[in-house]
Design a protein with these regions (language model features):
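A helix-centric hydrophobic-segment signal that preferentially recognizes long
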Residues: 2-177
């Protein structure tokens, strides 16, 4: 019989010393991988949380713009029928209801310009429209804070890698006034 180098014991597996203990090198590699994985999981959770918050703030802006759309017809009725401003308000309401994001901002600014021309108007429809617009502006400010926080993180390591892999995108920053 030939003598085995290990005297009948199992051969140690790769990365282990003959006593079966995990080598320091393997332990270091496992630790580094765990730390890197933890960093990326934390980054993804952060992006998920702030994307959700920015999306909720964006939905609030949309809801407040819907309130502006509801207030516009009553204010337009206080103007002379067929006037260019009344028609512009009606068009702006349609755009705010169905337009693209950029078109909605432009329409909002048009309504703001018309309201500024009639700043002395203290009638209830004008007051209701101003209140709805003020609420929309406050919602836009809250949205911009969330979007800015997310956009600042999304370009930094490790968030940029997680953003590319996860399909996260920057949120647009805008101003209603």
């Amino acid at each position: 019989m030939s003598k085995n180098k290990y005297n009948g014991k199992m051969r140690p597996s790769a990365g282990r010393n003959p006593k079966g203990k995990v080598s320091q090198k393997s332990l270091a590699i496992i630790s580094v991988c765990a730390i890197i994985l933890g960093i990326f999981i934390t980054a993804q959770e952060y992006l998920d949380r702030h994307t959700l918050a920015a999306s909720a703030a964006e939905a609030t802006v949309t809801e407040t713009l819907a309130e502006v759309v509801k207030a516009i017809p009553a204010y337009a009725q206080t103007m002379t029928a067929g006037s260019s401003e009344a028609d512009a308000l009606t068009d702006a309401a349609d755009t705010l209801a169905t337009g693209s994001f950029r078109e909605k901002i432009d329409a909002y600014r048009e309504v703001t310009d018309i309201l500024e021309k009639h700043s002395s108007d203290k009638a209830a429809p004008a007051k209701a429209l101003r209140e709805a617009m003020s609420t929309a502006e406050d919602a836009a400010v809250a949205y911009n804070k969330e979007a800015q926080a997310l956009n600042e993180k999304i370009v930094k390591f490790p968030y940029n890698i997680v953003a590319k892999l996860g399909g996260y995108a920057e949120f647009p920053i805008f101003s209603l006034n």
